[in-house]
Amino acid sequence: MIEIYYIPEEIRKCYSCVRAKELAQETTHEIKMYPIMKISDNDLGFEYNLDVIDELKERVGSSRRAFIYPQIFIDGIHIGSLSALQQHVEEVWGFF
C-alpha cells in the first residue's frame, strides 16, 4: 500500500503532491490519501487537519508538525517526499 499525506489541490496547487499521486497510480499498489488541510469558512479559506498531521508526526517520530509535502509511506515504511518516491519507483519497480 502507498500512503500519501498531501495538500489538496482545491486548497493549494502542490506539484509534488499531484505528481506523487500520479506515480502511485502507475503502480499496482493500493493507494490511501490523507489530506492535511480542509476547506473552511475562515479568513484563510482552509484549516489544518491537525489530527492527520499529528498522526503523521507520530508515525515518523517527529516532535514538530512542520513537514515538506507530500510525505509518503510504502507498505507502512516512511520513505519521505516526492524525490524519495521517484527514486524508489526507478530503483525498485524499474520505471519512472
Locate the predicted segments by residue:
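Thioredoxin-like thiol-disulfide oxidoreductase module
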Residues: 36-68
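Local sequence-structure signature of Cys/Sec-based thiol-disulfide redox active-site neighborhoods
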Residues: 1-37
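Short, aromatic/basic amphipathic alpha-helical patches
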Residues: 17-24, 51-58, 92
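Non-catalytic, surface beta->alpha helical segment in thiol-disulfide oxidoreductase systems
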Residues: 74-96
